[in-house]
A protein has these predicted regions:
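N-terminal accessory/pre-domain segments preceding catalytic cores
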Residues: 1-133, 138
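Active-site neighborhood of thiol-dependent amide/isopeptide-bond enzymes
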Residues: 118-171
């Protein structure tokens, strides 16, 4: 079944071609959706990620990791009263993707969603954005460093981060 994650047929075709090229490059071993029971939209979103994510992410993390994160994106959109109002393009390019910088990928999306959902579920989209910004400020303060960008959970644990780490944490 055709999903509605990408409603523009021309863009969907371009993405599908890019996805097919990526899988041809890395091999089907690195894209295994068997037993994941994806919906059509989840499958299309996962293909979108694979079409454009860094090749190292494809080979370093199992398909199930990205599928779980895709599901969380759709879960948040469904459970938040304003989720349906997030424009398709913004949802596709700024909610579904996991990577922000060169940070290690972790389970931060699940951890943060569980911590934030009750805090924002009764707010307008505008107020939810502000509340999440306040939450980020409560958890992490700016501190310069020369090290590799820390993962969102590492930034949470240390409660400090550079501007890139703060943006990675916020997203």
């Amino acid at each position: 079944a055709q999903g509605t994650f990408i409603s523009n047929a021309a863009y969907r075709t371009t993405m599908q071609q890019q996805f097919n090229e990526r899988i041809k490059t890395v091999g089907k071993t690195f894209y295994n959706t068997r037993n994941l029971n994806l919906t059509a939209d989840e499958n299309q979103a996962l293909e979108f990620l694979y079409a454009y994510m860094p090749l190292a992410d494809i080979t370093d993390y199992p398909t199930s990791f990205f599928a779980d994160n895709v599901r969380l994106s759709f879960q948040a959109r469904k459970e938040m009263p304003w989720g349906k109002d997030v424009p398709e393009l913004l949802f596709r390019h700024f909610v579904v993707p996991i990577r922000v910088n060169n940070e290690a990928l972790d389970s931060s999306r699940s951890v943060f969603y569980n911590e934030l959902k009750n805090r924002v579920k009764h707010l307008s989209m505008h107020d939810a954005i502000l509340e999440i910004n306040h939450w980020c400020h409560e958890k992490v303060t700016y501190q310069p460093s020369d090290a590799r960008t820390s993962s969102p959970l590492q930034t949470l644990r240390t409660a400090t981060g550079r501007c890139g780490e703060e943006s990675t944490f916020a997203v």
